[in-house]
Amino acid sequence: MSGQVTLQSSDQVNITVERAVAERSMLIKNLLEDLGESEEPVPIPNVNESVLKKVIEWCTHHKNDPQTTGEEDDNRRRTTEIDEWDQKFMQVDQEMLFEIILAANYLDIKALLDVGCKTVANMIKGKSPEEIRKTFNIQNDFTPEEEDQIRRENEWAEDR
């Protein structure tokens, strides 16, 4: 088994990485198993170069992490805690953050997807709907009447 693999981003840029790094992605791991020994670049059609490099940076840092079991995944998802390195890694602009989340989902890198989603959850935590709209530049398309109706229907969920 070769120690290196070449990935080709959606913008046709080839990036060579350690196989162990690339195999943090279940999609790439399965592709490599299906392709066998090949010198051809592995196409990653839904991820551009800058996002792929960010994902590879994360995978490189976490390449020696053990693959988690389903139960460990559940426990990890129940908390919004993020380790310090991952917090720093996720300090990117919103567009890049969402691109990383989409790439992690597409590439089937569950731990990275969790970190991205926890980052967004922490951005939302404790904010009012107005503050959330402002944070994510979301237009409010509800009429005041619709807002009142939604508040009444969800009164049970309000903090008291």
UniProtKB/Swiss-Prot annotation:
Q: Which GO terms describe its cellular component?
A: CBF3 complex; kinetochore; nuclear SCF ubiquitin ligase complex; RAVE complex; single-stranded DNA-dependent ATP-dependent DNA helicase complex
The protein's matches in Gene3D superfamilies, at most eight in alphabetical order, are given as:
Potassium Channel Kv1.1, Chain A
Q: What does this protein do?
A: Essential component of the SCF (SKP1-CUL1-F-box protein) E3 ubiquitin ligase complexes, which mediate the ubiquitination and subsequent proteasomal degradation of target proteins. Controls sulfur metabolite repression, probably by mediating the inactivation or degradation of the metR transcription factor.
Q: Does the keyword Ribonucleoprotein apply?
A: no
> Which organism was this protein described from?
Talaromyces stipitatus (strain ATCC 10500 / CBS 375.48 / QM 6759 / NRRL 1006)
Put simply, this protein is called E3 ubiquitin ligase complex SCF subunit sconC
Q: Which domain of life is it from?
A: Eukaryota
Cysteine-cysteine disulfides? none
Q: Which UniProt keywords apply?
A: Ubl conjugation pathway
Q: Which GO terms describe its biological process?
A: exit from mitosis; G1/S transition of mitotic cell cycle; G2/M transition of mitotic cell cycle; kinetochore assembly; mitotic nuclear membrane biogenesis; negative regulation of cytoplasmic translation; negative regulation of mitotic metaphase/anaphase transition; positive regulation of D-glucose transmembrane transport
> Where do the segments described as Interaction with the F-box domain of F-box proteins lie?
101-160
Q: Name one GO molecular function term.
A: DNA replication origin binding
Please give the pathway this protein is involved in.
Protein modification; protein ubiquitination
Subunit organization? Component of the SCF (SKP1-CUL1-F-box protein) E3 ubiquitin ligase complexes.
Which family does this protein fall into? Belongs to the SKP1 family.
